Structure formats: structure tokens, C-alpha cells
Amino acid sequence: MVLTVPVKGYFEEYCYFYVSDSTRHGLIIDPGAQADQLLDIIRDNGLVIEKILLTHGHFDHFGAVEKLREKLNCPVLAHEKADLFLLDPLMNLSRQCVGDMIIRDTVKFKDGDTIALDEAHSLRVIYTPGHTPDSVLLYNEKERIAFVGDTIFKESIGNYTFPGGNKDLLIQSIMERLFTLPDDTVLYSGHSEPTTVGAEKRFYGM
């Protein structure tokens, strides 16, 4: 089950809960702001959060991490290149927007790793640099879902002008890593309503 929660910090951003219906255990993906609201959802739905996952290291995707980590006592996972952003307020854009924010002590994953919730629920890491050098999507083949961060949105692509961004890499990631997923894969992004691989390919004339 996927729960979508819009959170409002400096930017509005979508945080996601990936939850087992049977056990109520779950993962939080990109908790950008409003930690108290997210904690209320966890309590009201009887959820047990095992891990916090980041699709990339911009502050609007990790703004609620520290409070959640303290309250939930769970690890925070990010790509092996994420410290370029998580430890640098200029790179993660917090200094320019809200004041310095950093995240330390994250567990690192890499392309191809599987992040397991239980035997029936897991997410595979697919490396998609371009928006940032640490950007990933988190994919479940059986359920045909992917949490794509800011790599792609409905009928648009991620920003590549921020520090570390690269237009050519972003387009390559979309074409070679994202658009090769099944057309019915639902894409959950950081700043737009869900779309599908097939819908985006059609939008771009493919």
C-alpha cells in the first residue's frame, strides 16, 4: 500500500509511506517537512516504521528526518553519494532557502541494492543521476510502482540547474533507466501527481 502525504515546508513536497497491509510495517520515503503531521499519521494508522529512505539529498526531501529518526528510532538510508548534499547546506539548498540543515549518520545504498520491508515487500534501487548525482528511484516490479524523487514529474522532468545537476545525465537516466520499466509502472514523484511510464513516453512522443 502507498500512502501519499503532501507536506508543506519552503516548497510543497510529496512524502510517501510504503506499507504492508498485513503487518502495518512500513517505510517512509522523502519526509520533507511537517514531522508532527507524519507522526500523527503513523500513530493514527497503527504503523511501525522500519526505515526512512531518501531519493536524493535536497533539504525539501529530508526536512523532517531528524525529528522522525529521534521519535521512531529507525535508520535513514540514502545513496552512497548523498553526503555531497546531506552534509553541505549549499549543495542541499537549505542555506539559500531556510537556513543551514544537514543530515549525518545515514546508511548508504547503491545501484541494484534491494531494500526489504518483509518477504512480500521490497524496493530495488535504480540509480538515476541528473537532477543530482545521488538521485535514485525505488522500484517494486511486482506492484509496478516507483518512487522517483525529482527525476521526472507528470509531463515534465527534474530541474538540472541546481548544484551538481546535469541535463545530459538526467535525460540519459530517464531514457535508459526509467523509460525501460513497464509502461504500467506508476511513478510517484516529489512534486506532482502520480503518472505512469507509458503516459510519460506518450507525452514525449515515444
Region roles according to the model:
Residues Q34-H121, F203-M206:
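Active-site HxH/HxHxD metal-binding segment of metal-dependent hydrolases
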Residues S122-M206:
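Metallo-beta-lactamase
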